[in-house]
């Protein structure tokens, strides 16, 4: 029965995304919600200017509808589900505001870094307040073992750091057609398996709903993309995957399963540090996916390579937790 629920969930999430797209994409075009491409980016990206953005709305709507329907039909609404939806929608709304300012108000940078950071921290604080009052644990477990360390009052600081850092890391990965959609589907799929293994079926249903939603979106986001998810989608997905890691006590494993996001972020950090200290750049451009474009790789080759890396890291994460 539970296996059927998972199958129905991924199919429903996929179909809702696929069916929404032909309606929503022309609507975005009519509103002139087109992506602006930065001039310092790869020249090959200039032709993408004007491609509809804010498509993350479709992903979020699919996740909400699928999760609610499947939970009401086969399970019951749990606090885990409420927390997952809260963070996903909260970070999605923050991303929507950022996209809206960029696209409609023509402020290229959207929200300021300070404004975005405050929004991310506020959502993380509300999440942790509910998490804490539900008597949730403050320990972090070593993957593949029963060994854990209680961080006590430091844990909320770590939660805020993980949510802010994780959502931004996922956001940085959204730079090529289909790159984030594919890597997100893989990472959420891995966490769905691990949540299922823990008998946290509500979390597994949510994770599978995300897989279905992003795969449906990928149909229209694969190269050449007809729509971009924007910060609306990338921040929502980032917040969601970190929340899953916290609820399943797999915070450390997130670094492995979400390894592509971590590597992309490290490439930006290293690039900035190197340039500020030596005046030289390590990469031709950061995040890392742009470096490979500038050394001559096709966009599709970069995307497939990163998907493959994400899949290998996801398998490694599952192996460590389940079979090691």
From Swiss-Prot:
Domain of life of the organism encoding this protein: Bacteria
Keyword Cell cycle: yes
GO MF term set: metal ion binding; phospho-N-acetylmuramoyl-pentapeptide-transferase activity; UDP-N-acetylmuramoyl-L-alanyl-D-glutamyl-meso-2,6-diaminopimelyl-D-alanyl-D-alanine:undecaprenyl-phosphate transferase activity
Reactions catalysed, as given in the entry: UDP-N-acetyl-alpha-D-muramoyl-L-alanyl-gamma-D-glutamyl-meso-2,6-diaminopimeloyl-D-alanyl-D-alanine + di-trans,octa-cis-undecaprenyl phosphate = di-trans,octa-cis-undecaprenyl diphospho-N-acetyl-alpha-D-muramoyl-L-alanyl-D-glutamyl-meso-2,6-diaminopimeloyl-D-alanyl-D-alanine + UMP
Keyword check for rRNA-binding: no
Keywords: Cell cycle, Cell division, Cell membrane, Cell shape, Cell wall biogenesis/degradation, Magnesium, Membrane, Metal-binding, Peptidoglycan synthesis, Transferase, Transmembrane, Transmembrane helix
InterPro entries given in the database record: Glycosyl_transferase_4, PNAcMuramoyl-5peptid_Trfase, PNAcMuramoyl-5peptid_Trfase_CS
Gene Ontology biological-process annotations: cell division; cell wall organization; peptidoglycan biosynthetic process; regulation of cell shape
One Pfam assignment: Glycos_transf_4
Cellular component per GO, a single term: plasma membrane
Cofactor(s) for this UniProt protein: Mg(2+)
E.C. no: 2.7.8.13
Top EC group: transferase
Membrane topology: Multi-pass membrane protein
Places the protein is found: Cell membrane
Pathway(s): Cell wall biogenesis; peptidoglycan biosynthesis
Role this protein plays: Catalyzes the initial step of the lipid cycle reactions in the biosynthesis of the cell wall peptidoglycan: transfers peptidoglycan precursor phospho-MurNAc-pentapeptide from UDP-MurNAc-pentapeptide onto the lipid carrier undecaprenyl phosphate, yielding undecaprenyl-pyrophosphoryl-MurNAc-pentapeptide, known as lipid I.
Family to which this protein belongs: Belongs to the glycosyltransferase 4 family. MraY subfamily.
Protein name listed in UniProt: Phospho-N-acetylmuramoyl-pentapeptide-transferase
Species this chain originates from: Bacillus licheniformis (strain ATCC 14580 / DSM 13 / JCM 2505 / CCUG 7422 / NBRC 12200 / NCIMB 9375 / NCTC 10341 / NRRL NRS-1264 / Gibson 46)
Lineage, highest ranks first: Bacteria, Bacillati, Bacillota, Bacilli, Bacillales
Gene that encodes the chain: mraY
């Amino acid at each position: 029965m539970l296996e059927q629920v998972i199958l129905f969930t991924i199919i429903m999430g996929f179909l809702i995304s696929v069916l929404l797209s032909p309606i929503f994409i022309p609507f975005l075009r009519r509103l002139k919600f087109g992506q602006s491409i930065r001039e310092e980016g790869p020249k090959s990206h200039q032709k993408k200017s004007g491609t509809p953005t804010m498509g993350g709305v479709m992903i979020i709507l699919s996740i909400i509808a699928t999760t609610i329907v499947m939970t009401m039909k086969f399970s019951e609404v749990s606090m885990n589900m409420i927390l997952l939806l809260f963070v996903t929608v909260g970070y999605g709304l923050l991303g929507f505001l950022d996209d809206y300012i960029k696209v409609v108000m023509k402020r290229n940078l959207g929200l300021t870094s300070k404004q975005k950071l405050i929004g991310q921290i506020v959502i993380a604080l509300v999440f942790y307040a509910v998490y804490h009052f539900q008597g949730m644990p403050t320990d972090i477990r070593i993957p593949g073992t029963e060994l854990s360390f209680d961080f006590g009052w430091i844990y909320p600081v770590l939660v805020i750091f993980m949510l802010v850092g994780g959502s931004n890391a996922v956001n940085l990965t959204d730079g090529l057609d289909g790159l984030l959609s594919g890597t997100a589907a893989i990472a959420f799929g891995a966490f769905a398996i691990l949540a299922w293994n823990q008998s946290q079926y509500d979390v597994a249903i949510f994770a599978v709903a995300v897989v279905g939603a992003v795969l449906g979106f990928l149909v229209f986001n694969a190269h050449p993309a007809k729509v971009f998810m924007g910060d609306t989608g990338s921040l929502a997905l980032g917040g969601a995957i970190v929340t899953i890691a916290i609820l399943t006590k797999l915070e450390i494993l997130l670094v492995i399963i979400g390894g592509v996001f971590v590597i992309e972020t490290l490439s930006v950090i290293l690039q900035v540090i190197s340039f500020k200290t030596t005046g030289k750049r390590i990469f031709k451009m950061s995040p890392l996916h742009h470096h490979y474009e500038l050394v001559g790789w096709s966009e599709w080759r970069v995307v497939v390579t990163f998907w493959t890396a994400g899949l290998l890291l996801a398998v490694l994460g599952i192996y460590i937790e389940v079979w090691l």
